[in-house]
């Protein structure tokens, strides 16, 4: 943790770098002190990806994860206390061996309670040589698909709700690309929270660039 903070501070001091966005973080790295130090860096984007994998403690134990759902929830709370409406994203695996309907329901309820901006939902697939590949109670592909579809619907709803918080507000956008939709040209970029934004390009602007 100390070396990561030192690195972020050093990068923050580099002239010309205006945004620092962190990659995936281990949940246990998030402490009150760590989050408070990050919040003091104006270039640090309030977008944090904390991999969860499952919202059920029994499933997490079979996955050999070194945290539980309550610890994870506390980490999200720390970030939300340190930053104003941070974007928290995560990874979730459905259909891990032994995942029952009750465990999946617990995961879905947990995700709804913690509330994420985005979730990357993956269906568990066997990998030769891993402990999970030979575990009993492998989940059928059809069940994995149904569970994945359900969480993707939830993800779309939560993401839309998070983005709606910014309607009517002024935000900084880093424009990085151009796109054309139905004959109209737009410049595309992201806010510090990694919310995608599009700005209609006036014809005169487009021709001059």
Describe the role of every protein-language-model region.
Residues 92, 104-114, 121:
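A glycine- and small/hydrophobic-rich beta-loop-beta segment
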């Amino acid at each position: 943790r100390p070396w990561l903070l030192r690195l972020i501070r050093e990068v923050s001091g580099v002239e010309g770098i205006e945004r620092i966005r962190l990659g995936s973080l281990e949940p246990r790295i998030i402490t009150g002190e760590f989050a408070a130090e990050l919040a003091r860096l104006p270039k640090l984007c309030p977008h944090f990806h904390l991999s969860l994998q499952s919202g059920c403690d029994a499933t997490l134990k079979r996955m050999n994860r070194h945290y539980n759902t309550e610890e994870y929830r506390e980490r999200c709370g720390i970030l939300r206390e340190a930053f104003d409406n941070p974007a928290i994203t995560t990874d979730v695996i459905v259909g891990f061996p032994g995942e029952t309907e009750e465990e999946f329901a617990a995961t879905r309820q947990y995700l709804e309670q913690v509330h994420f901006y985005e979730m990357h939902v993956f269906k568990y697939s066997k990998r030769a040589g891993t402990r999970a590949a030979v575990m009993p109670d492998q989940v059928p592909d059809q069940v994995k698909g149904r569970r994945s579809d359900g969480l993707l619907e939830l993800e779309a709803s939560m993401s839309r709700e998070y983005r709606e918080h910014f309607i009517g507000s002024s935000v900084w956008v880093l424009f990085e690309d151009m796109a054309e939709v139905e004959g109209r040209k737009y410049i595309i970029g992201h806010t510090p929270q990694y919310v995608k934004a599009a700005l209609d390009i006036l014809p005169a602007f487009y021709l001059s660039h």
